[in-house]
Amino acid sequence: MGGGTAVLGALDNKKVSAVAAIYPSVTSPSAVQAARRIDTPGLVIGSGQEDIFNAGNPAKLAYNWRGPVCFRAIDKGSQAGFTEDRLRKLAIGTAAFQSGPTEITRGLLTGFLLATLNDDSTYAAFADPEASAKKVESLVGEDLAERAGVTRDA
């Protein structure tokens, strides 16, 4: 729920200069609804694969973002694999920990924050909604709407 609560915490908060929602899940009140009122630059990271638990709709959150937003889908990444309890998962033998996608996510987050908060042009691509990278899919416009499950009325 951390990604969704980051969005809720940024709502009407003048101290917030950037928001990162990593694998945001469903929240109450709705982070998707709150995103419609956030002008702060945002980074929303979702999975490049279907989640069997349907924890949330990161693409819909990004689609509803009022201000500038970057949506990134990480290949083979998921909410379940992005965890800090790596040692426990390794000790009990679960294969849920995803070191590659986790490192990609950390890199995207760091670059986005450096570009946005430090206004560092070296990292400008990390804040570009259409930037591409290996094992990362960036979606905007109609592609983002399709991933979000949003359709226009005919």
Where are these regions (language model features)?
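Gly/Ala-rich beta-loop-alpha elbow adjacent to hydrolase catalytic centers
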Residues: 1-6
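Conserved hydrolase catalytic core segment
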Residues: 8-17
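The feature captures the conserved acid-bearing segment of alpha/beta-hydrolase catalytic domains
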Residues: 17-84
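Alpha/beta-hydrolase-fold serine-hydrolase catalytic core, especially in secreted/extracellular enzymes
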Residues: 76, 85-154
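Sec/Tat-exported extracytoplasmic proteins
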Residues: 14, 23, 116-117
